[in-house]
Every structure is written in C-alpha cells, then in structure tokens.
Amino acid sequence: MSNKNNDELQRQASENTLGLNPVIGIRRKDLLSSARTVLRQAVRQPLHSAKHVAHFGLELKNVLLGKSSLAPESDDRRFNDPAWSNNPLYRRYLQTYLAWRKELQDWIGNSDLSPQDISRGQFVINLMTEAMAPTNTLSNPAAVKRFFETGGKSLLDGLSNLAKDLVNNGGMPSQVNMDAFEVGKNLGTSEGAVVYRNDVLELIQYKPITEQVHARPLLVVPPQINKFYVFDLSPEKSLARYCLRSQQQTFIISWRNPTKAQREWGLSTYIDALKEAVDAVLAITGSKDLNMLGACSGGITCTALVGHYAALGENKVNALTLLVSVLDTTMDNQVALFVDEQTLEAAKRHSYQAGVLEGSEMAKVFAWMRPNDLIWNYWVNNYLLGNEPPVFDILFWNNDTTRLPAAFHGDLIEMFKSNPLTRPDALEVCGTPIDLKQVKCDIYSLAGTNDHITPWQSCYRSAHLFGGKIEFVLSNSGHIQSILNPPGNPKARFMTGADRPGDPVAWQENATKHADSWWLHWQSWLGERAGELEKAPTRLGNRAYAAGEASPGTYVHER
C-alpha cells in the first residue's frame, strides 16, 4: 500500500475511531422496521413516488448525454481517482449512482412521514446506498489498476484477507494489523509501576522525568469500555508523557476487564474502587487533594465521584478535567436516532442475560453508523486492493476492546433515559444523592467539533451543570483525536470563550480561535491549580503502597 493511501486511512481512523460512551445499540429489528416503513411509503404515496422516478429518469438522460452536472462532494475521497472524472464510462457510472442516491434521499425527505421516521428512513437508505457505492465493487478503477500491476495477485490476496475475516473477525473487514503492536513493548511504554490494586482497578504511578514536580498530583481516569493506554500510545502521542514533561505527578487508572462473574458491578462499585485509588494517591504524594481527569464514560464516573464527595463534605478533588464527556444526555444525533423505551430495555435485557456487554459488539454497532469510514474504507483496502490492514496504534487500541458488567451498563442506560445529573438528588451513588451544583471545584471541559459519539453541544450543556468555575474548550477534531492532540500539529485548532451563554452556538460564534493543540492551554490551566513545585520523588509508591509490577501492569493484558 502506498504511503499516501496509508496516511489517508490513518487520517480517517483518527477522526472516526470509536472510544465509546457505551449506552445502546441499534437492533436489527429497528432497522427492518424502518425499512418496512420506507417500502410502505412507496405504496401509500404513489404519485409522490412516480414524481421522483420521473425526475430520476430525466437526470439519467442527462447523464447518458453527458450533460449532468452531478459530482461527489469535495470531501468525499472515495472518488479521488482521476478515472471517475476523466473516463466517460466511469463518469457516467458515478453520476448514475449519485442521481439514484440523491433521488432516494429526496423521496423520503419530502414524504409525509413524521420527522423521526424520515430520519430513520434516511439512515436506512444511507446504509443501502453506501454499501452499493461503485467504489465497493471490483470495477473500482484503483482495484482494476492494482490487479494489472500485480498480475492478479491483489485479487488472490484480497480473497485471502476476506477468508481470514470471515473466520476471525465476524465477517467485518479488519481495521488494523493486530500483530504489529504489543502493550508494554511499543505501546504503553512510559516508565512506572502499579502502586495499588483491587478487584476493579490497578493504580499506576509514572516515574517523574523532571527534577521538580507540582505538589498536587494528577489522577487520570480512562473510559471503562477501552483500555487506559490511549493516554500512553507512542511517545509523541502520549498525554501521560506530556504531563510528566509538564512537571505533573501523574497517576492513571487501569480498569479490570470484567467477566460474567462481575456482572453485578455497578456505578457505585466503580466509585468505591476509585475512592480507594484516590486515597492511595494522596497517601503516596502527601497532598491533601488532587486534580482529576476523566474521559468519555470515565468522565461520568469522575463526575459521580465528585458529586459523592460533595454530598459527604469532602474536598479531595481540587480541579476536574472532562474530555468528550456527556452528562446531559439530551442528544440529537445518530446515537439517539433509534432510542426509545423498548430499545433501552432490550439493551439492558441483552447485557443482563449475557452478564456483560462486549466492547466488540458496541464497536460493530458504531461502525455501521459511519460505514464509509469504518467499514467500506477497509473493504476496499483489504479486499479490492489486496493490501494488508494498516498498522496504526489508535486502531489497535480501538480494537483492543473490553467488556462492561451488566449492572454498570444498566446504570448507564438509566442515566441516558432519565438524565438524572441535570436534576439535584435524582441520582444516588454509594448511598448519597448527587447534586452537581454543590460541586464547587474548577472544571475544564473539552469537546470536539467533529465528534459523532459525544456531540460538542451536549458536552457544552454538561459543563454548565456544575457549581464551580468552568473553562469550556472546543477542539477541531473528532472523538479520539480531540484527546490525542499533541502540540506541533499545523492543522490543530481550538476555541475558548469567557462568556458562557446557554446556547452552545452563541458561545461558538463569539469564541476566540487559537492555533495549535489544546494540550498547551490545558497545561497552563492545570499548572495554576497544581500547587508549588517541589523536588521530584526518587522512588515510586511508599511504605504503605509499595511499587509492584512495572507498568502497564496486569489488568491491561486481560482479554
């Protein structure tokens, strides 16, 4: 595979990787129901359907006569090969497809269905039309060229890759070469040690790399559905290493990968375990409080913890950073498109019957929400071009999924359904009611403009639930790339704004734009809240919490 193609796959992976807020899936039953609604519409409105068939016929005539102006969107890189525009046959093939796709979307969009049924119908039609894109066939000009360049070997290699995926990957195209990485060898390599372990988590303390460190430590809490080393990928992408260079005493949680035996672990179980880790960090560093960072579902866990501390009158968290975390679950995106009472209850029932929610199941669901980027992209690369799956650390991490205990999954579903964090005392954790307005610590909330899992508008509303001072920052990236955003990227941008109106769009219109990574802005913010500089410790842990196994520990290797 050429470097250009490999770079393009990596770019799309960075923007569309699914480090998840695990709540629900899309049931096949719901998709079939929406498909039936679409088919019934053709019968119920025959004149409406005939009008669009006639319009498609007129456009098809223009295509055949070479008079059509239809062209793919400028950012649709599937059709970058010059043959799609220069070759008359390929150009007509493409324009016929574009005309058909447009007419189907217009047909359902202009129907008399309800807005929800129109959105669902458009989603189903999009699944069908993207699957039938001309780039997904052996007539793809890039595949034809590759076939002749390799003397047919690309076709044999593609069939071999397909056979492997049918056997080993549930028939889904592999997104990454899983043999290219090993956690602890070329991922998660920052030096440190496990200084505390319980049934739920391991606490890793990283070795300082500066002569002085801030007195107040930082505890990083990753999402439970994926593994912690998203914060410690390659050295140049490692947020943990960046924190160490910024003189932060850095600790990170590594969650255990639960099995059916842990099916009863709920949110309170994770909070109790996290409280033990907080006490260990404070005992090791001698600080009376710490700063905390939570991402995705880890951000929900951190939020529940600080709400619990507020109810107890304990001030163990000085400042909280939330990365792409939705607490106000009023959402209007594809994640919520098929959500209703039946869907939520079915999702809970499914995980309770299995004992756990498999992360691989959630990854498949979300892949079908972005089929071009997360399925057909790799279909073309692996099968039509006969290339090996790309070697990319983010994709390896994304495919190294974990499970969620049924009880915790049920808790997340109930939060999604009833939105309790938006109301005082509507959620109870570890025996205490949660009122986020009583949480007075400073909040740094980061969201991504292109995030299709945790929409930035929802993150903005979520930040306003707290009673402390808020710093909201909007990065020009997707879900995971918002987190993995090291300085020096010439395309990186972020926005800040002191005024915080209730309307997210109003905030965006008046926000200040900045070049480079939000990491720089965050470290400045965090440094002001991290205490005085002191001599860095020369050893990890202490007498009560002795340094044990070297990082990345044991739990990260559990499958």
From Swiss-Prot:
It comes from the Bacteria. P.oleovorans accumulates poly(3-hydroxyalkanoates) after growth on medium chain length hydrocarbons. Large amounts of this polyester are synthesized when cells are grown under nitrogen-limiting conditions. When nitrogen is resupplied in the medium, the accumulated PHA is degraded. GO terms for molecular function: acyltransferase activity. Pfam families: PhaC_N (PF07167). Keywords: Acyltransferase, PHA biosynthesis, PHB biosynthesis, Transferase. The active site is at C296. The keyword Transcription does not apply. This is Poly(3-hydroxyalkanoate) polymerase 1. The keyword Acyltransferase applies. It comes from Ectopseudomonas oleovorans. InterPro entries: AB_hydrolase_fold, PHA/PHB_synthase, PHA_synth_II, PhaC_N. Belongs to the PHA/PHB synthase family. Type II PhaC subfamily. Signal peptide: none annotated.
